Amino acid sequence: MSRVAIITGAASGIGRSTAHRLIGQGWSVVGLDVSFGSELATSDKVDGLKTLYCDVTNEGSIVDAFGTIASTYGHVDAIVCSAGKLEIGPLSEMPVEDFDRLYQVNTRGAWLCARQSIPLMRKSPHRDKFPRIVFLGSIAGIRPKVSGGAYGAQKAALHVITSVMAAELGPEGILVNAVAPGTVDTPMVQAKSDSSKTGDYRPSGNSPLGRVAAPEDIAAVIEFLLGEQANYVTGAIIPADGGTRAAFIPPAVQG
């Protein structure tokens, strides 16, 4: 019986790249996204990917999507919660509606999807090696920066959720980890780069490597966390920021 993975936010960016990698490793992958249709279908963009509509801000939509997955596959071995939303700007000026919308996707939605997957993980026939939960955190949740306060705060909350769920689910053999990327060249970040004048999302991503991450760079870390080499890794928040945090010099001491 094949391993079954769910990936939220699978229509583009990190989610799509992760789906491609896992399918190449023999996984059966169901991608969830608001841009997909309401019936389980085969993607015309990623060979082997099954797609299904899901709005992670709506608990009913999540329940419906997972019900379809349960009736089709009977179990789940892994979930990658990569659906995300980015808004930048001063916390003191951010509209409440924008803050709430970010929270609904980045924190609450990720937690709801992970929670909904647990009963299906308990039915996995591969309990000797799985299940796994991987959240998409952010380096912004480790090293806050001006203009990214709301996003960083909500990703920091997700890091706490990762740690606590790892402790809660460890006795059942369910591993829970998070990847904390720096700037990644995704449509979401590109859109903010085009509209932002803050400089925080410029093409180099402030990395000493001189470039931002490609989605494939982050997907590779996720693939590791879902593989046998990570059998003893749980509760980890793994930075994948190209050295951005290591090279950070506070503005007050620059000069």
Segments predicted by a language model, with ranges:
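Short, small/polar-rich loop/turn modules that mediate ligand/substrate recognition or access, typified
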Residues: V80, G170, L175, V233-G235
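Substrate-binding pocket helix/loop in short-chain dehydrogenase/reductase
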Residues: P90-L91, D98-Y103, P203
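Active-site loop immediately N-terminal to the catalytic Tyr-X3-Lys motif
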Residues: S92, R143-G149, P171, G210, ...
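Active-site helix of classical SDR
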Residues: A114, Q154
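Alpha-helical segment proximal to the catalytic Tyr-Lys
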Residues: P119, A167-P171, N231
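Residue(s) in the substrate-gating loop at a strand-loop-helix junction
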Residues: S138
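Short C-terminal tail/terminal secondary-structure segment
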Residues: E223, T234-G255
